[in-house]
């Protein structure tokens, strides 16, 4: 028995997608959340590989890094290039020097049930910059903006949910191939979901 929310019954988008899946004999296995449940979190394993940041990771602090000193603008340009991001939103001074970085991929920067979590992480780990997937603009955005305008060396780079997590999913086939030897496994990039005008 499959679960179908009431609001989808008869929905044109749902019916067309269901037909596409059925006609092409596609099986879908949504595994993303399981990637986060492993230790270490496989999304961050992939992110660290892609950015070559393993050596910058703070032991025992899986979302925190100490990188070579750079500016917010330079860090943003690096992340945009490596993660294939078209647009980065910045709060704080773009010329601010940063070394201590927090990186909360996808919805992690929403706080995972505790909307103050990103701000507490920034404060408790004395982070210069928080790199985020998606944010609650009325909390984290305001906190970082206030800190920067009050003269503290604080900034935030927002890259989007999809682009910060897809890079970790890219490494799923490596892991999965070991579990199903002989079965072809590959990664298909979803790409940037937005168009920018």
Predicted regions located by residue number:
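Hydrophobic structural segments
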Residues: 1-197
């Amino acid at each position: 028995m499959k679960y179908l929310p009431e609001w989808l019954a008869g929905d044109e988008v749902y019916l067309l997608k269901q037909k596409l899946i059925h006609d092409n004999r596609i099986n879908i296995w949504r595994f993303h959340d399981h990637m986060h449940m492993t230790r270490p979190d496989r999304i961050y394993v992939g992110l660290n590989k892609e950015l070559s940041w393993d050596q910058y990771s703070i032991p025992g602090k899986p979302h925190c890094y100490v990188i070579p000193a750079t500016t917010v603008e330079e860090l943003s340009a690096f992340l945009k290039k490596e993660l294939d991001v078209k647009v980065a939103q910045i709060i704080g001074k773009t010329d601010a020097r940063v070394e201590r970085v927090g990186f909360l991929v996808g919805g992690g920067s929403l706080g995972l049930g505790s909307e103050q979590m990103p701000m507490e992480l920034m404060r408790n780990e004395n982070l210069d910059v928080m790199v985020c997937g998606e944010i609650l603009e009325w909390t984290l955005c305001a906190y970082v903006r206030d800190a920067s305008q009050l003269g503290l060396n604080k900034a935030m780079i927002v890259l989007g949910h999809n682009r910060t997590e897809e890079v970790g999913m890219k490494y799923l086939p490596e892991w999965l191939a070991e579990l199903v030897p002989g079965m072809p496994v590959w990664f298909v990039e979803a790409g940037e979901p937005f168009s920018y005008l």
